[in-house]
């Protein structure tokens, strides 16, 4: 009897521990926009740090995600296979009582993911980013940002605060570089094969690991430390596209001893760094 009671008590304790355990990693499929908060138990809302969402989210869901980012523990957000749809509540109201809402499907708006994130992977289905000239959608510096898919153009101001790793998915074909001084600052960058040109001030850093094998054109100061400053790239090897035709003066400065592989191409000597 004592053995039976001991086993019963152990079973009850185990079930209680499981019942009240808080999850730090969650994957949620949200098929009904506006219902994301109902898909996550309250106890997990306080503890989740790593959240993956698929399905459909609207303004109400983004408002809830912002709450998890700013007032709870969420720091890793993966929306790669989610779809942002119009509707729902305003996800943010600023100090001037201006409401930020989602009015169009597959669109990222200003301050949408403003919070304490370290990792953000945006939906592949995004086709438009609508932010102010000097603001972006995540506000604060972030370690890792993954962006692109159906998006064709990317403003540099929308990615310049990614500090450690920036991955731009296949499909993005061009950068929009205004305003000056907002180039990419990430130390490790993956460019898609669909980007063929680096325009003026694409990168705002002096140390970067980036694949440039598919780049056919390097613009003036496309990699420089900061606007009028010139930085020395702290890399050992550069391998260029076989289709490289123009290498502009002051595209970037290399440290002494850097090895350059031109893949048997013969660049037109418009100008050399």
PLM features: residue spans?
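Boundary/junction segments of secreted and surface-exposed precursor proteins
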Residues: 20-40
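Structural signature of tandem-repeat unit edges
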Residues: 23-30, 49-57, 74-88, 96-103, ...
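Accessory end-domains appended to solenoid repeat scaffolds used in host defense
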Residues: 5, 47, 58-67
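Recurring C-terminal helix/loop segment of individual leucine-rich repeat
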Residues: 111, 131-135, 156-157, 177-179, ...
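Leucine-rich repeat
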Residues: 39-44, 65-70, 109-113, 135-137, ...
């Amino acid at each position: 009897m004592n053995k039976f009671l001991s086993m019963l008590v152990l079973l009850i304790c185990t079930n209680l521990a499981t019942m009240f355990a808080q999850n730090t990693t969650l994957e949620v499929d949200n098929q009904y926009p506006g219902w994301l908060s109902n898909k996550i138990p309250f106890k997990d809302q306080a503890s989740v740090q790593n959240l993956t969402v698929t399905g459909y989210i609207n303004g109400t869901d983004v408002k809830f995600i912002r709450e998890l980012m700013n007032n709870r523990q969420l720091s890793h957000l993966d929306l790669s296979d989610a779809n942002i749809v119009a509707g729902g509540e305003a996800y943010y109201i600023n100090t001037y009582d201006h409401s930020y809402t989602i009015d169009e499907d597959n669109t990222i708006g200003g301050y949408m993911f403003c919070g304490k994130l370290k990792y953000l992977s945006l939906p592949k289905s995004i086709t438009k980013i609508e932010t102010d000239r000097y603001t972006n959608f995540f506000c604060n510096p972030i370690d890792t940002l993954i962006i692109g898919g159906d998006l064709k153009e990317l403003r540099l101001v929308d990615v310049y605060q990614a500090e450690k790793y920036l991955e731009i998915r296949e499909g993005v074909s061009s950068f929009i570089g205004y305003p000056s001084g907002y180039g990419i600052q990430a130390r490790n960058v993956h460019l898609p094969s669909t980007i063929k040109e680096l325009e003026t001030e694409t990168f705002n850093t002096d140390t970067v690991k980036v694949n440039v094998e598919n780049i056919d054109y390097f613009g003036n100061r496309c990699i420089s430390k900061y606007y009028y400053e010139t930085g020395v790239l702290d890399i050992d090897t550069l391998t260029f596209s076989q289709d490289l035709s123009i290498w502009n003066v002051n595209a970037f400065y290399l440290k002494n001893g850097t090895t350059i592989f031109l893949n048997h191409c013969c660049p037109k000597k418009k100008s050399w760094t």
